[in-house]
Amino acid sequence: MRVIFAGTPAVAIPALAAVADSRHELLAVVTRPDAPAGRGRGLSRSPVAAWADEQGVEVLTPARPREPEFLDRLRALAPDCVPVVAYGALVPPVALEIPQHGWVNLHFSLLPAWRGAAPVQHAVLHGDELTGASVFQLEQGLDTGPVYGTLTDEVGPADTSGDLLERLAHSGAGLLTAVLDAIEDGTARAEPQPVDGVSLAPKLTVADARVRWGDPAFAVDRRVRACTPAPGPWTTFRDERVKLGPVTPVADGPELKPGELLVERSRVLAGTATTPVRLGEVRAAGKRAMPASDWARGVRVTVGEVLA
């Protein structure tokens, strides 16, 4: 088939590369426009656009995919299908209807669970033991279209969202190309999503990433892993924001108040609503990340001080 790939962040690259290496003809990519990035806030190409530039593939960057110029170019290219991974914009019906086989989306959850922008983060945050990826027909609803195929992946006890997303990006690439092959062969079958089991996964905010020391230790651990690497778990110490690396629940730890710090010879503990957690890395504003023990010595944590 003749295809145009729609996607924006780095997580879309494995699928884009797989499509480019498949039996299908990659005509162009559709991605979000250049956006400010870095401390200098200069305009930066999306990872998908940068990949396409290196490969000599045409790049389409409509501010909105309903723009007449974009729709005209889409019609002129005449794709049979548009595979999508994390494009980042709502696609209007007029664009969805242009390819013969529509737009086919790779989503990183087992639909209908975790529809929305942050399915992997919510799977980790809510303690799911099993997640996966789904390829479905894009329609106007939020991730509501019929599903062509799925794959599963176990969520490990130490998995961060970044770990899980990287695995799903690569395994999902194979699922997406297999669905494209089946569509071309006429063997693809899309099944409606179940009515039961629907959950939503809105984007996690910086406020969501603030550690809640009044939660049980297992929930603190989940929040830290869910928000790693983005938006980045954080807390405050002496009214200054600090970022946190991994934490480990300590089942036999001493009794501490929520957020209360205890500095021992080889570890730093912080209290929760249940048992404490061991801090991994800490990064103060303007500083590099360092082991929690080094941080505690540097700031001279005193008895009774807390993270908040």
Curated annotation (Swiss-Prot):
The keyword RNA-binding does not apply. Disulfide bonds: none annotated. It catalyses: L-methionyl-tRNA(fMet) + (6R)-10-formyltetrahydrofolate = N-formyl-L-methionyl-tRNA(fMet) + (6S)-5,6,7,8-tetrahydrofolate + H(+). Keywords: Protein biosynthesis, Transferase. Transmembrane segments: none annotated. Its EC number is 2.1.2.9. InterPro entries: Fmt, Formyl_trans_C, Formyl_transf_N, Formyl_transf_N_sf, Formyl_transferase-like_C_sf, Met-tRNA-FMT_C, Met-tRNA-FMT_N. It comes from the Bacteria. One of its GO terms (cellular component) is cytosol. (6S)-5,6,7,8-tetrahydrofolate binds at residues 109-112. One of its GO terms (molecular function) is methionyl-tRNA formyltransferase activity. Pfam families: Formyl_trans_C (PF02911), Formyl_trans_N (PF00551). Belongs to the Fmt family. Attaches a formyl group to the free amino group of methionyl-tRNA(fMet). The formyl group appears to play a dual role in the initiator identity of N-formylmethionyl-tRNA by promoting its recognition by IF2 and preventing the misappropriation of this tRNA by the elongation apparatus. This is Methionyl-tRNA formyltransferase.
